[in-house]
Amino acid sequence: MVIWRRYLSGTAQPLVFKKMNKALAQAAPREHVVRRLEQPVGMPQPPTAATRYVEGNSMLDMFSEEKTSRRAAELAAEFSKSGLYDAATFRKTNGRVFLPPASYWRAEHARYFPHLGGRTLTGARGSVEDVLAGKVSVVKVFSCETGEGLASSYFRHEGHDYLREDDVAPAQIVEISLTESWIKDWLVRLMAGRLRSLVPAARHERYFICRRAQLPFTVRESLELGNLYTGYVLVVDPQLKIRWMACGGAEKRDAELLWKCVRGVQRECAAV
């Protein structure tokens, strides 16, 4: 018994826990600063059905000082941006947690939309990238009713409501409801009948219900999709690259900028 106790009671704390404790102790919510998006957002590699975004360290990584330090910093950032932080930021900014870029990003610099799998309003399972590929799309992303309402304001343009009149929209519209938990996922699916009555039938196969957990915290941050309460609008080109992005409610000039960017990307694609 003495030997057993001796082997299990080392005095040194495992490296990963030391790094984590230090980082968490220094983590404190910082005042959110609204800034304009300038650098392209997205993933470095195109999405595929086999893509999985992993967060955390393997057992071997726990013995690497560099990897444990990086993971500790990630955990500290996630800890500092809790649901309460998201709610406070949303109230302060009215959902405009960042300002959109003044124009669309050039194709050679743009980054990719992530892989997301889910169920559409038709009841079929599928990957979002399969619907996006080959077309210029305007993608609406939200996790709650408030966020959906804000993002929907970008689709009211020139006397039309493109979400109600899908046949007049200048580009393909794709909607993604990111459910925060299995309970919310179940509730959204329970309401699928009501959603089908609100969304034009032609767009049912382009309305996805996806689990938010597919995108770990660090991935959501790199995509600027971190705030749970606001809504997002993205312009995605036929090669699945994010060319423009906005969040929160749209003023008239914001909606005009969105559809101006859509036309610009469409002209660019037609010229290739």
Curated annotation (Swiss-Prot):
GO terms for biological process: mitochondrial proton-transporting ATP synthase complex assembly. The keyword Membrane applies. GO terms for molecular function: unfolded protein binding. It comes from the Eukaryota. Its main location: mitochondrion. It is found in: Mitochondrion inner membrane. InterPro entries: ATP10 (IPR007849). Keywords: Membrane, Mitochondrion, Mitochondrion inner membrane. GO terms for cellular component: mitochondrial inner membrane. Involved in assembly of the mitochondrial F1-F0 complex. Belongs to the ATP10 family. This is Mitochondrial ATPase complex subunit ATP10. It comes from Eremothecium gossypii (strain ATCC 10895 / CBS 109.51 / FGSC 9923 / NRRL Y-1056) (Yeast).
